[in-house]
């Protein structure tokens, strides 16, 4: 039976009024919850993909409000979202709810478990596709958390004794990537080349992690260097119209000219068509794999400081704002962040000066953190830099920040502190975060809609919000929660 529901049709029904109350958390009676759930299940079977996703969002919200996760369990099983169903089976299904079907589903999903990770249907298909194409040029388009880092590691192992390069778009991502692959590369490659001066043309094999500028210098240094494989992380950046994207295109052209059989692995969180990665003057063909699963469903909030309209919820399906605290006036951005923050928060700003200024403003309204580890960290940083360094003031209040001016050694140190210490709740960062740097967070506050000299593009915005509530945080067996299937994104202007 055809289900031709569209959002335009649904907007003009009584359902929209009930949904508005539900989505901003107003208390409903049992009959209203049952009505919402029945309609949501109907939506998940619609032909329109937007209606399907809206139905899924309603089911997730229903389950988080009522703590009845059986509807989400059944939908997750049917849609191949096995990390969701497995987490529910382990944490929310009581013994008296178990039956033949739950036991059969449990046994069925075992095939999608690898170590401590349960893969979704498309995640499993992605890995199988990648493993069959080690020697081919391919593109992988998958959201954050779909295991692109694991694909990089497996490729490095596959190219043992050969020449392989991982291209990263920023020095921050370069450092993070090097740290991740260093352990598995021992015994496979003599070293990890991260700077042109480290490269030795006499080495038979080579594992390099470089930005496009550094790779270009290495290629100029050794005209005979020919790579067997180049992994291009954050490959969508090649489509941007700027000097760095042109350098990236240049090194790809040179690499293929030197070795026509070089295998390129283009990894990106979004891509409309893999053919868009075909560069002029190259001859490679691209096979693409694109993930279309919808597991996380973001909740967007707008706090309008200029017009004093308080907090509003933005519904991306109905394209409208719903007031939550219309008479509230918190006055300044730091007060909004303080009131609506969670245990771990990412705050986005565009300029280094704005980042440091806001970090100090936020520090001024927060209490000092009582932690020996934080005190020791402040002492260590004071020895490395001048004691008046703003970062130390912020660190004492549970805040870190990083941008291009923060030394690499300090940045790595404070990132590890943020990941491992509950006392540090806030990280304030720039577009570095868009380049694949991964930090745990439950909520995001976007205080600037610009990236560099232009506005955040649609794709950059999606990439940014995708950094919140990664799968390893949602489905962690000890600390995970399905509340994180609904990451909260606050836009404060």
Predicted stretch roles:
Residues 1-493:
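N-terminal helicase ATP-binding lobe
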């Amino acid at each position: 039976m055809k289900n031709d529901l569209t959002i335009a049709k649904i907007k003009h029904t009584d359902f929209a009024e009930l949904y508005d109350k539900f989505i901003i958390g107003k208390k409903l009676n049992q009959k209203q919850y049952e009505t919402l759930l029945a309609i949501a299940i109907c939506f998940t079977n619609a032909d329109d993909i937007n209606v399907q996703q809206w139905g899924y969002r309603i089911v997730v919200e229903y389950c988080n409000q009522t703590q009845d996760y059986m509807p989400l369990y059944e939908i997750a099983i049917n849609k191949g979202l096995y990390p969701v169903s497995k987490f529910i089976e382990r944490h929310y299904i009581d013994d008296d709810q178990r039956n033949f079907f739950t036991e059969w589903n449990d046994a069925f999903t075992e095939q999608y478990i690898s170590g401590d990770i349960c893969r979704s249907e498309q995640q499993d298909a992605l890995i199988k596709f990648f493993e069959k194409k080690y020697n081919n040029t391919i593109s992988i388009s998958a959201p954050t958390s779909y295991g692109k880092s694991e694909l990089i590691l497996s490729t490095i192992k596959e190219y043992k004794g050969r020449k392989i390069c991982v291209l990263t778009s920023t020095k921050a991502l370069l450092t993070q990537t090097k740290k991740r692959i260093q352990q598995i590369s021992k015994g496979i490659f003599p070293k990890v080349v991260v700077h042109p001066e480290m490269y030795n043309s006499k080495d038979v094999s080579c594992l390099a992690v470089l930005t496009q500028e550094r790779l270009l210098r290495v290629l100029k240094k050794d005209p005979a260097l020919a790579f067997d494989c180049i992994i291009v992380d954050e490959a969508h950046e090649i489509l941007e119209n700027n000097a760095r994207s042109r350098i990236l295109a240049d090194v790809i052209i040179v690499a293929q000219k030197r070795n026509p059989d070089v295998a390129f692995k283009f990894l990106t969180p979004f891509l409309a068509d893999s053919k868009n990665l075909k560069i002029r003057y190259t001859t490679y063909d691209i096979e693409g794999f694109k993930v279309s699963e919808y597991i996380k469903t973001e909740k967007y909030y707008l706090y309008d400081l200029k017009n004093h309209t308080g907090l509003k919820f933005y519904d991306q399906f109905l394209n409208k704002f719903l007031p939550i605290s219309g008479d509230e006036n918190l006055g300044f951005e730091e007060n909004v962040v303080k009131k609506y923050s969670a245990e771990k928060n990412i705050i986005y700003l565009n300029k280094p000066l704005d980042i440091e200024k806001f970090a100090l403003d936020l520090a001024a309204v927060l209490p000092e953190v009582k932690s020996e580890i934080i005190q020791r960290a402040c002492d260590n940083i004071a020895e490395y830099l001048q004691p008046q360094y703003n970062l130390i003031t912020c660190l004492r209040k549970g805040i870190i920040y990083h941008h291009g001016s923060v030394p690499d050694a300090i940045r790595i140190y404070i990132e590890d502190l943020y990941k491992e210490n509950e006392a540090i709740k806030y990280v304030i960062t720039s577009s570095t975060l868009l380049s694949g740097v991964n930090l745990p967070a439950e909520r995001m506050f976007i205080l600037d809609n610009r990236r560099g000299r232009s506005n955040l593009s649609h794709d950059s915005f999606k990439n940014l919000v995708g950094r919140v509530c990664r799968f390893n945080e949602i489905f962690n067996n000890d600390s995970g929660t399905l509340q994180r299937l609904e990451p909260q994104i606050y836009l404060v202007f």
